[in-house]
Amino acid sequence: TVYRVCYQSLWEDFVVAGTARLMDEYGLDGVYLDGTGCLLPCYNHYHGCGPRDGVGRAHPRYTFWATRSLMRRLWQVVSSRNPNGQINLHNSAFMTVPTIAFATSLWDGEQLSTTPGRTLPERMPLDYFRTEFMGHQWGLAAEFLEYVLPYSYRQEWGLTLLHDVPTRPYGPHDQLELASQLWNLMERFGRRQATWLPYWRNGDVVTVQPSAAYVSLYRHPRNGVLAVVYNYGARATEVTVALQRAKLGLAERVVATDALTGMALDCEGGTLHLPLDSLGWQLVWLRQEQ
């Protein structure tokens, strides 16, 4: 059972005070909030909601400012006790900027259980992902929620890696193993120091075929290029990626490897030919030949 509450009530003080007490008693690093930043209708006239019209019929009130006040106060509680403290907000589909602005990260995706469509591209067009799930326009780190879609954890990582977004492990132990491999890879490559070149903005340095395939790139000043190659098509296919090596700061002769397994890949002339299943992906690390 899910119990919804309105923060234009004593619940605001209750949640804030309870969070402060728990952090003080147990030294918590922060809080996970499940839907706390969502705006929901309230009809309770005892705390100022549910205004009535001329015939006595109650109407809902959406308490933006009360919910924003709660989130702001929670941020003050967490950050004053731990400057690196986390407010991890699960707010699927409710991208209400006044309330989510005080979180440190977002977890989004549960609404996809009811999104129309038979295949993943039908249920998640790429412009939909860019609009809601990247976190850039909210100024927040984003994670993707994967457990509602009928696809494997690995398959969903392809979609999110393409957008520089991690898929949170939630379930079997092998999910954490894959996630940790990817986290470690990004640390080794130097993702924080790299320039990200997403698939919709890198046509001057790379081309990819067929049309249902995409590639996003990370360009590091010393460590080469990390390519995320993804087949968003309905069938297995060979994906061809042609890199403009000079524009990417790569030497004429480069070494290409599968970034997770270390397996050598052919990159003759700066071109990769990768057989990928539908929703399959591969991370390719390209470096100067030693």
Regions found by a protein language model. Give the residues of each.
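Aromatic- and acidic-residue-enriched carbohydrate-binding clefts of CAZyme catalytic domains
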Residues: T1-S9, L39-R72
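Active-site-adjacent "subsite" loops/lids of carbohydrate-active enzymes
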Residues: T1-Y26
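Short acidic/polar active-site loop segments enriched in Thr and Asp
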Residues: D29
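Conserved Walker B
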Residues: T36
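Active-site-proximal substrate-binding groove within the catalytic cores of carbohydrate-active enzymes
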Residues: T63-L250, V254-L260
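Short, solvent-exposed loop/linker segments at beta-strand-coil boundaries, enriched for Pro/Gly
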Residues: G262-A264
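C-terminal beta-strand-rich structural cap/linker in extracellular carbohydrate-active enzymes
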Residues: C267-Q290
